[in-house]
Design a protein with these regions (language model features):
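C-terminal "cap" of GNAT-fold acetyltransferases
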Residues: 116-117, 136-152
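Conserved GNAT acetyl-CoA-binding A-motif
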Residues: 96, 103-116
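Conserved N-terminal entry element of GNAT/NAT acetyltransferase domains
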Residues: 1-11, 152
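Conserved acetyl-CoA-binding loop-helix of GNAT-fold acetyltransferases
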Residues: 82, 88-101
């Protein structure tokens, strides 16, 4: 269940970096929190702030084709990060729901992501399906699976 009184808001790219570094780059070979798609036209960054105005959750939503239906509009979820002390509190689902609403406003047929295996159950519980074999992601060197949700 989500923590009380938290709202998902659009944020600037630079606001994502500290939380991405802390959550997504820990125990990986890189400390760089930037993505090539961060400034791509149409990219949206979402965030949730605590009562002290600290960013405690973030996600990035990029217009990027789903490789198995490249003619359809699709949104790739990247950089989903929830501060360690707020994980399993519902904030990830709040971000996911807001991002899916965003994707629907763009008439996206799919939302997809390269999900870390450590987060795979989260996506499966939230109406994504795993697609294909697992792989080791090049930047983090961590095991991942493609996940996708068909919106219509």
């Amino acid at each position: 269940m989500a923590e009380p009184n938290f709202q998902v808001v659009k944020i600037a790219t630079e606001e994502t970096y500290a939380l991405r570094s802390a959550v997504l780059r820990a125990d990986t070979p890189t400390s760089d929190p930037k993505y090539a798609e961060d400034s791509k036209p149409g990219t949206v960054h979402l965030g949730i702030f605590d009562e002290n105005k600290n960013l405690i959750a973030t996600s990035t939503w990029v217009i990027n084709p789903w490789q198995h239906d490249s003619s359809a509009m699709a949104i790739q979820l990247r950089g989903m990060a929830v501060a360690t002390n707020h994980q399993k509190s519902g904030l990830g689902k709040l971000l996911l729901d807001a991002g899916i609403i965003h994707a629907k406003t763009l008439n996206a047929k799919y939302v997809w992501a390269k999900a870390r295996d450590s987060a795979l159950d989260f996506y499966l519980r939230n109406n994504f399906v795993s697609f294909g074999d697992g792989f080791t992601e090049g930047v983090t060197q961590m095991p991942h699976h493609l996940v996708v949700q068909k919106l219509f």
